[in-house]
Design a protein with these regions (language model features):
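Alpha-helical transmembrane segments and their membrane-interface boundaries
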Residues: 1-285, 293-336
Length: 336
């Protein structure tokens, strides 16, 4: 099954438009970083996340959802920024709790699942961005600012679809307690603990890139063992090839700044354009883009590439450990 996943290339899934949009977004993000720094990135991410979290419904219900989502995001931003890299235990506990709720929220419908996935990613980003701000409240206000911008955009287009929403952002506590006794609930505990461990080790071992380990765990660890193994192998292979390819390109073009920038933008384009063609190919170009970005920013690209590979391997190991625990738990439950 793994070999088939490695060699399978579904060219019908090429998304050229998505690749071009990604290049545009990369350019905009670079400009925002140059002009506004960390807080500009935080506001931009918050606006994007709130817009993605928007669901069809009456304008009033949608704006209430925006307010709720923005408030939760702001609270998580404060907690994540306060913990940051200086309090890895607290950061890991926060990450574990959010990922647990995100996994449980999947039982509440697609809307709740998407919102909590976005909040999980937001916490990861906050931990990474926290070193760029002086006070935790700054990232909280940035998320509220992004929510305000998104709310204005949603209000402007609010005359569109008017159907029922799919559920609340926060699952009722009765649902949380009920799900704890189900296979999904037990998997949510394992996934949350895995994310917490990944956050702690990421901050401890990769202080410059603490998010890479936990992101690998979030992407790789699935309820199905086969899917977890497949995606873990593909991500490892793609990351390894990405470091190798980018390092080779830098050996040849490293002295030509514009050529490296072009390679960086092309990697971003190919990453999304080929995302659904093959996950290993996606991981290859994602890693290459990150290595080129490190070179452009004046960092040691080879060292950063090796760090990403090691972080990915650690994330894969944690995810595989998580699926072993899940499988053992299900076997024990079935036996009893």
């Amino acid at each position: 099954m793994i070999a088939g996943s490695i060699y399978k290339l579904d060219w019908s899934q090429v998304n050229l438009r998505g690749g071009l949009v990604t290049v545009l977004v990369i350019v905009v993000v670079a400009l925002v970083m140059a002009l506004f720094g960390t807080l500009g990135i935080a506001v931009g991410l918050a606006t994007l996340f709130v817009m993605i979290a928007d669901t069809p419904g009456s304008l009033r219900s949608r704006l209430v959802a925006v307010l709720t989502f923005s408030s939760v995001g702001a609270l998580l931003a404060f907690g994540g920024a306060w913990a940051g890299s200086e309090r890895p235990v607290l950061a890991s506990l926060l990450m574990a709790a959010v990922v647990y709720l995100a996994t449980i929220a999947a039982a509440r419908g697609k809307s709740a699942a998407v919102r909590w996935l976005l909040l999980s990613i937001w916490v990861v980003m906050v931990i990474s961005l926290s070193s760029g701000v002086e006070r935790p409240i700054e990232l909280s206000l940035a998320f509220l600012g992004g929510g305000l911008l998104a709310g204005i955009g949603i209000a402007v287009r609010g005359w569109f679809a008017d159907v029922d929403d799919e559920g609340d952002l926060l699952p009722p506590m009765s649902v949380v307690f009920a799900e704890m006794r189900t296979p999904l609930g037990r998997f949510a505990v394992v996934r949350g603990l895995a994310a917490g461990v990944a956050t702690y080790l990421g901050v401890l071992l990769f202080p410059e890139f603490p998010v890479w380990v936990v992101i690998a765990v979030l992407i790789i660890l699935r309820e199905e063992r086969g899917a977890t193994i497949d995606i873990g192998v593909l991500r490892t292979l793609g990351t390894l090839l990405g470091v190798a390819v980018a390092s080779g390109v830098l050996v040849i073009l490293g002295e030509y700044g514009l050529a490296v920038i072009a390679a960086f933008l092309f990697s971003g384009f190919a990453m999304i354009a080929l995302q659904k063609v093959n996950y290993a190919v996606f991981s290859l170009f994602l890693t290459a883009m990150l290595v080129f970005a490190l070179h452009v920013s004046g960092e040691d690209a080879l060292e950063g590439g090796v760090a990403r590979l090691l972080a990915t391997l650690l994330g894969v190991a944690i995810a595989f450990g998580g699926i072993l625990v899940t499988t053992a738990d299900r076997t024990s439950t079935q036996s009893s």
